[in-house]
């Protein structure tokens, strides 16, 4: 079984964990339907991106 040869210092441990923070996801309003969507992504509600329909939505 593998074991560390030396104890990891608090500084090295914390530097490794520096990138583990969670970030809030920012949402943008779809100009077509007003739903919240991810920036630079197709709207999941209406299928529009950059002013045009790229995903055809089924009529419900």
UniProtKB/Swiss-Prot annotation:
InterPro entries cross-referenced by the UniProt entry: Ribosomal_bL32 (IPR002677), Ribosomal_bL32_bact (IPR044957), Ribosomal_zn-bd (IPR011332)
GO annotation (BP), single: translation
Name of the protein this chain belongs to: Large ribosomal subunit protein bL32
CC terms in the record's Gene Ontology section: large ribosomal subunit
HAMAP family for this protein: Ribosomal_bL32
Similarity comment: family membership: Belongs to the bacterial ribosomal protein bL32 family.
Native organism: Paramagnetospirillum magneticum (strain ATCC 700264 / AMB-1) (Magnetospirillum magneticum)
Gene: rpmF
Pfam families in the record: Ribosomal_L32p
Superkingdom classification of source: Bacteria
Keyword Nucleotide-binding recorded: no
Entry keyword annotation includes Ribonucleoprotein: yes
Gene3D superfamilies: Single helix bin (1.20.5.640)
């Amino acid at each position: 079984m593998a074991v560390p040869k030396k104890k990891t210092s608090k500084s090295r441990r914390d530097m490794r964990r520096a990138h583990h923070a969670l970030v809030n996801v920012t949402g943008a309003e779809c100009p077509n339907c007003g739903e919240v969507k991810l920036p630079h992504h197709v709207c999941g509600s209406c299928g529009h991106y950059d002013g045009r329909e790229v995903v055809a939505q089924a009529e419900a």
